């Protein structure tokens, strides 16, 4: 069995973790995420410099949960997947600032992956042996509406999926021995409403096979 803090320490399931990186700032956009019949609050992220992961505040979050471990359960640390961070950096107008700070896209991917590896190592150092990547990007890619948006920008769905896959796997390179990594995939959940819809056939060759 695994236990978590239920994300009660966070204002968002994903953004608080992203705000914990060096080089990323908290911002407010003109509108929030649009779920089925409902809009969220307007929080987002902005790159302000080189992204790195040392001294991440979620290490303290984990240490709080770890005290409740016993022979029947292990403390699990959940966090948004690296692909989710990348998606947020290119959410609507965010991409312009991201490209201005990181004109070399490959360097952006490498820095995100390195930042995650740093956090993973710091969590491992305080006893964490179970980490879960929460990743809504796969549900987004499978959504016909998002696929139509990509077509309008002459972007191939397969290229986006391949980049998300590569980034997630880069972040897991050289992970410590004995560390379990799991992932949670969904279409979003806000007041029991959803953000994405559609099947997973498009992403299965990436998400499930690689």
PLM regions: where:
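Domain-level signal for soluble alpha/beta catalytic cores
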Residues: 1-210
